[in-house]
Curated annotation (Swiss-Prot):
Keywords: Cell inner membrane, Cell membrane, Ion transport, Membrane, Potassium, Potassium transport, Symport, Transmembrane, Transmembrane helix, Transport. The lineage of its organism: Bacteria, Pseudomonadati, Pseudomonadota, Alphaproteobacteria, Hyphomicrobiales. The keyword Metal-binding does not apply. Its main location: membrane. Belongs to the HAK/KUP transporter (TC 2.A.72) family. It catalyses: K(+)(in) + H(+)(in) = K(+)(out) + H(+)(out). It comes from Bradyrhizobium sp. (strain BTAi1 / ATCC BAA-1182). The gene is kup4. Transport of potassium into the cell. Likely operates as a K(+):H(+) symporter. This is Probable potassium transport system protein Kup 4. One of its GO terms (cellular component) is plasma membrane. GO terms for molecular function: potassium ion transmembrane transporter activity; symporter activity. It is a multi-pass membrane protein. Pfam families: K_trans, K_trans_C.
């Protein structure tokens, strides 16, 4: 009884993230409208290609019973995976208001990458890396499926669909550097119009054949799987496309909070999707067999071109949400120490989450356009879609089980029961998507595996750098003794030494004195730490320790979603000498050169060149930490690994 009561209290207690709309003083219904434009682009445009893909998996011919079984699978996939798993459980696993698989990984303590936490870290990193894999396919399949709607009216435009898609994608990626601050406010209303249109179109199909509503009975889905044999797995692979955008609910939780995201899902998105799929199924039953896309065939001929235009806008919005999510996930991975520092530009001075990461943008553009040209159509591309995100959803469930046990302290039986239900569904879809590997499913898996390799290589290399610096540094006691004895000449001014190490006297400071023969009158040895929490309160941000006359050791902590401004943060530090002149301080940083040590480990032989390349091309400290470039001195240093 006590355990049941505790679970009830957990379900009824608001999370930190539910206060997001309250903190911004934005009414929940307006926040829900905003969520339509950011969170539900991918899920909302899935009716463009999902049922078409399923129809192809069945060979284009099916009975009324099989059509109802497929619709029932779509209905209950949306209910179990999105309505229950993500809306009720996964979104409860907020990391101080932030969501996403990397935030979940940090919540369960996997970012330490030690002991058994390594397994959880691998799950989180692999899940995040695979999202990049499907992220390069989403814009391609969405834009192609929208443009292919013109084939319903005339086949003469078919040769121009792929070139037009490539042109649109080039403009789309090229425009990312300008941000979406000015037009982003229109995303929500446009997607609201989209959902209303697909709901009305679905209703027109249902009116012709109301019997499709019986698909709400899950026995239709169970019966279909029981009697479809091996073809059922192929159909499941197509059905999965209706939820490929499910991770966005969790990833964008920090922007809107669970409340508005749930409100828009239950009130608008879910009913519209169900009506659209039901209407398309009614059309399939009516015709018995169908060629082309049932989504556009629901529309009267006079409305196809306007619908194609609206679908084009909706798919661009869906692609925008994928790109924005990739930028945000890249920043999280950087702050948590899993990726090198990339140049990040804030594209809005009002909305924190609107950022632009050039290297990610151009890499995704090249991959997306290459995929569009290679596959040429949405039906061929559907074979490559879903393999990566199905793996991510499976890994999310595994991490969710860990959160149930470690964070929420749930009983083992309850955790197994709930996570086990989700695992059954996830494993089923995972197995179905494995059948797509030969049809192109290898592509997002390979792309994700490459990102995963880069993440592990970077983290291993950075840990090796810290260990090498710690072993090579001189004893700080001798340096402090020389300072106390007046053996180190002091010159006027303030110097701030940026260091990765945690020693009280960092090697950079000692090397500076050794080569220059003097030290500034006021010195700050500064280490920047990125914590597993998304944000750090100002009163907890800095730790200050005076270690010698005129020398302070400062440790500054930031959350993994924060953009550090060191100059501004240092001015708020308490415990420093008031005479320190931060406005004219000189910042000292290193520009390290990575080389292989003779007889080094396997890491140096085959991964060191990769790490050295990443290290060499990482963003400079002056750019990452908003330092004044005319007051930064970089010192070259060779590090053997």
């Amino acid at each position: 009884m006590l355990r049941a009561t505790a679970l009830h209290e957990w379900l009824m207690t608001p999370t930190v993230a539910q206060d997001v709309s309250t903190r911004t003083r934005e009414p929940q219904h307006w926040a829900a409208l905003g969520a339509l434009g950011i969170v539900y682009g991918d899920l909302g445009t899935s009716p463009l290609y999902t049922l078409q893909t399923v129809v192809q998996a069945t060979g284009g011919h099916f009975t009324t019973a099989s059509a109802l079984g497929i619709l029932s699978l779509l209905v209950w996939t949306l209910i179990i995976t999105i309505s229950i798993k993500y809306c009720l459980f996964v979104m409860r696993a907020d990391n101080h208001g932030e969501g996403g698989i990397l935030a979940l990984m940090s919540l369960v303590g996997a970012n330490r990458f030690k002991g058994t936490a390594k397994i959880l870290a691998v799950m989180g990193l692999l899940g995040a890396a695979l999202l990049y894999g499907d992220g390069v396919i989403t814009p391609a399949i969405s834009v192609l499926s929208a443009l292919e709607g013109v084939n319903v009216v005339t086949g003469s435009l078919k040769p121009f669909v792929m070139p037009a898609a490539v042109a649109i994608l080039i403009v789309f990626f090229a425009a990312q550097r300008f941000g979406t601050a000015r037009i982003g406010a229109a995303f929500g209303p446009i997607m609201l119009l989209w959902f209303l249109v697909i709901a009305v179109l679905g209703l027109t199909g249902i009116v012709r054949n109301p019997s499709v509503l019986t698909a709400l009975d899950p026995r239709h889905a169970i019966g279909f799987l029981a009697h479809s044999g091996g073809n059922g797995m192929l159909v499941l692979g197509g059905v999965f496309l209706c939820i490929t955008g499910g991770e966005a609910l969790y990833a964008d939780m920090g922007h809107f909070g669970p409340g508005p995201i749930r409100l828009s899902w239950y009130a608008i998105v879910l009913p519209s999707l169900l009506l659209s799929y039901a209407g398309q199924t009614a059309l399939l039953i009516q015709k018995g067999t169908i060629e082309g896309n049932p989504f556009f065939q629901l529309c009267p001929t006079w409305g196809v071109y306007p619908l194609v235009f609206l679908a084009m806008i909706a798919t661009i919005i869906a692609s925008q949400s994928i790109i924005t999510g990739s930028f945000s996930m890249t920043r999280q991975a950087m702050q948590l120490g899993w990726l090198p520092g990339f140049h990040i530009r804030q594209t809005s001075d009002k909305v924190y989450g609107q950022i632009y990461v050039p290297v990610v943008n151009w890499m995704m553009m090249v991959a997306t356009i290459g995929i569009t040209i290679a596959f040429g159509s949405s039906d061929r591309l559907a074979g490559a879609y879903g393999t990566a995100v199905s793996t991510t959803m499976l890994l999310t469930t595994c991490l969710l089980f860990t959160a149930m046990r470690k964070t929420w302290r749930w009983p083992l039986a309850v955790s197994i029961l709930i996570a086990g239900l989700f695992l059954i569904v996830d494993v089923g879809f995972f197995g179905a998507n494995l059948l797509k590997i030969a049809e192109g499913g290898w592509l997002p898996l390979t792309f994700g595996a490459l990102v995963f390799f880069l993440m592990l290589t970077w983290r291993s290399g950075i840990d090796a750098v810290r260990e090498s610096l710690a072993q090579a540094s001189e004893a700080p006691e001798r340096f402090v003794a020389d300072l106390a004895a007046g053996k180190v000449p002091r010159v006027p001014g303030t110097a701030i030494f940026l260091t990765r190490t945690y020693q009280k006297i960092p090697p950079l400071l000692i090397d500076h004195v050794k080569h220059m023969g003097a030290l500034h009158q006021s010195v700050i040895a500064l280490t920047i730490l990125f914590e597993e929490s998304p944000r750090i309160d100002d009163e907890e941000r800095c730790g200050v320790e005076k270690i010698a006359d005129g020398i302070w050791r400062v440790t500054m902590r930031f959350g993994f979603v924060e953009i550090p401004d060191l100059t501004a943060a240092l001015k708020r530090v308490k415990g420093l000498d008031p005479s320190i002149d931060l406005d004219h301080a000189i910042y000292f940083a290193t520009r390290d050169i990575i080389v292989a040590r003779a007889g080094s480990s396997l890491f140096a032989h085959w991964r060191l060149p990769v790490f050295a390349f990443l290290y060499r091309n990482a963003v400079k400290v002056v750019d990452r930490f908003s330092l004044p470039p005319d007051r930064v001195v970089e010192i070259a240093r060779q590090i053997e690994l």
